A protein has these predicted regions:
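Charged, glycine-rich intrinsically disordered N-terminal tails and low-complexity linkers that flank
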Residues: 1-14
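Nucleic-acid nuclease catalytic cores
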Residues: 13-126
Length: 126
């Protein structure tokens, strides 16, 4: 029904719709790298990273509240990339949302982050 507010846990359901699979919050490591995932698919093909919507990320929003991963601030790119390295996933749905005091969703922005070879190598090299 339209009068039922969207609750914070429901943002994960929206991410699952974008990704097309169920997501599970997990932590993982690979060698000296570790990552925590707001969501990882069972086949480890996709990850989901969720942050609080900042003015910096809000300014990136373009069509239909999506923005390009190249526009994503570097510290978020590094986090997404490290998650892809550790999980072996091919892409990460990055979401940022703002919630009201009553746990109602105010705004959400998304982008698909796909591995960037140069950044990946910098992380691997330390």
């Amino acid at each position: 029904p339209e009068n039922i507010p969207l609750r914070i846990p429901d943002i994960a359901l929206g991410a699952e719709e974008f990704i097309g699979a169920e997501l599970y919050p997990v932590t993982a490591s690979l060698g000296n790298l570790s990552a925590s995932f707001d969501g990882l698919t069972l086949n480890r093909g996709r990850t989901w990273e969720h942050k609080r919507l900042s003015a910096e990320v809000r300014a990136l929003g373009h069509f239909s509240n999506f923005f390009g991963a190249d526009d994503l601030p570097l510290h978020y790119q590094v986090q997404c990339e490290q998650g892809l390295i550790v999980s072996g996933a091919t892409g990460c749905l990055f979401s940022a949302s703002e919630w009201g005091d009553d746990d109602n969703l105010i705004e959400v922005r998304h982008c698909w982050y796909i591995s960037q070879p140069a950044l990946r190598q910098r992380i691997i090299d330390g």
